Regions:
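Adenosine-phosphate binding glycine-rich loop
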Residues: 23, 35-148
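A structured beta-alpha segment of the ubiquitous adenosine-cofactor-binding alpha/beta core
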Residues: 1-32
Length: 148
């Protein structure tokens, strides 16, 4: 790319942008650099790319964060579908549909209830896990204190 400017990896966070997608390593955004981030939306493409304290600070600044286990669930969906013999086209279509639906649901829930997208995502995940477990023998234990 002859027209591009090469940056040091630590300078990438200083770029003013609309959407910032940390997609490689955990804890890329942390308490030491979160104030340098100049964006409107963070889509967590990596696993745990933002520390909890940094995510709370972004929320205080009005910067929306789509949690990692919502934004990067495509790999899990792909693996499950490939295991069952789905075609590449079907896998890509399903990933797109599920990620859009889950993201929309989490953001709407967060907005309506006045909670963070992460809190809404955790509640959605717990609801789905409980429902899935109710179909199995684990349902016998679902009333135990502290059980998912």
């Amino acid at each position: 790319y002859g027209y591009a400017t090469q940056l040091d990896r630590d300078e990438v966070i200083d770029i003013d942008c609309d959407i910032w997608i940390p997609a490689a390593r955990p804890d890329v955004i942390n308490e030491d650099n979160v104030d340098r981030l100049k964006t409107k939306l963070v889509i967590e493409g990596a696993n745990i790319p933002i520390t909890a304290a940094a995510e709370a600070k972004l929320e205080q600044r009005g910067i929306l964060c789509v949690p990692d286990f919502i934004a990067n669930a495509g790999g899990v969906i792909c693996a499950a579908m490939e295991y069952h013999g789905a075609s590449e086209g079907m896998v890509l279509q399903t990933i797109g549909e599920k990620l859009r639906r889950n993201t929309r649901q989490v953001l709407e829930d967060a907005s309506i209830r006045g909670i963070s997208p992460r809190e809404a995502a955790v509640e959605l995940a717990l609801t789905r896990v409980r429902k899935a477990m109710s179909y199995r023998r684990y349902a016998l234990f679902s009333t135990a204190p502290g059980f998912v």
